[in-house]
Amino acid sequence: MPLSRLIINDFRNITTCDIQLSSGFNFVIGPNGSGKTSVLEAIYLLGHGRSFKSSLTGRIIRNDCDELFIHGRFTTPEQFELPIGINKQRDGTTEVKIGGESGQKLAQLAKVLPLQLIHPEGFELVTDGPKFRRAFIDWGVFHVEPAFYDAWSRVKRLTKQRNALLKTANSYRELSYWDLELAQLSEKIDQWRVDYINHISEATQQICQAFLPEYDIKLSYYRGWDRETPYAELLKKNFERDKQLGYTVGGPNKADLRIKVAGTPVEDVLSRGQLKLMVCALRLAQGQHLTEATGKQCIYLIDDFASELDSHRRQLLAQYLKQTKAQVFISSITAEQIADMHDDESKMFEIEHGKIAQG
């Protein structure tokens, strides 16, 4: 479902804006420091309940203001208008509205607004620790498997309880009750993740063939413990070691997605421009699977589109984004950098000092 309207109040350097959006490409053009990234950040906040640039609410609320508001309107497949909104206050209080109803959860907001972000710091997906790739996998599973969110939340609570018990337990018997449910849920989560990676691997490789034809890129999934060992057996076997360490060593919270070229991690082979295309391929494959599995379209947020990409690679990425028929928001310093993508269906917005005007 594309956003048809976006209203931003007191976010970063934006006092207020109210813009009508294209269901296709939307370009936000402006010099560095103008606020163009803030527009994408506001949309991300609307879908995730948090910023991708700061974890501190006080830093994203405009100076001398006590709260921020971001509102959006969707056009549903039935052509109804669905309003959504988020309000954040300096004390950390957050209120979410969906369809005019207050008290909604952030997970519900994320479900109705599936967003994919590609930004200059996005290399962390392939270059940094496993937590970024787990988040990547779990974003996808969350959107296609309705039971995932509750199951994963329960696993995290059970693991926390288990870690607390490890500090006082004298025998494994004291943990066996908790471990039974933990093992069952962990195996279920693992299977959902396996199925998901199997679904997106082929799409990722196909997109990589277009973006990076000189490389044969392979994805492999590590579940967080030995593939041949049932998790219940591992928990019992590792009790003494876990007790000594004070936490549970293996489990679904240690899962990883390994991305390699001829057996070598991609970050040791690809240039920065190629790594950006690798990240784009992963995000686009997720969006493709989301549409195939649910009928929903991703919304793509691409901050600093031209960064790390030469004109040929920019053109490749733009062509693929157009093929998705998804709604896309792109920030750029100059209109020349995105001239080839602009058409009659797209909209261009110029921003300077936090003030937005349609170009």
From Swiss-Prot:
Domain of life: Bacteria
Localization terms from the record: Cytoplasm
GO annotations of cellular component type: cytoplasm
One family name in Pfam for this protein: SMC_N
GO terms of biological process kind: DNA replication; DNA synthesis involved in DNA repair; double-strand break repair; SOS response
Residues the record lists as binding ATP: 30-37
Keywords for the protein's UniProt record, in alphabetical order: ATP-binding, Cytoplasm, DNA damage, DNA repair, DNA replication, DNA-binding, Nucleotide-binding, SOS response
InterPro entries tied to this protein: DNA-binding_RecF (IPR001238), DNA-binding_RecF_CS (IPR018078), P-loop_NTPase (IPR027417), RecF/RecN/SMC_N (IPR003395), RecF_2 (IPR042174)
GO molecular function: ATP binding; single-stranded DNA binding
Function: The RecF protein is involved in DNA metabolism; it is required for DNA replication and normal SOS inducibility. RecF binds preferentially to single-stranded, linear DNA. It also seems to bind ATP.
Family: Belongs to the RecF family.
Matching PANTHER family: DNA REPLICATION AND REPAIR PROTEIN RECF
Protein name: DNA replication and repair protein RecF
Lineage: Bacteria, Pseudomonadati, Pseudomonadota, Gammaproteobacteria, Vibrionales
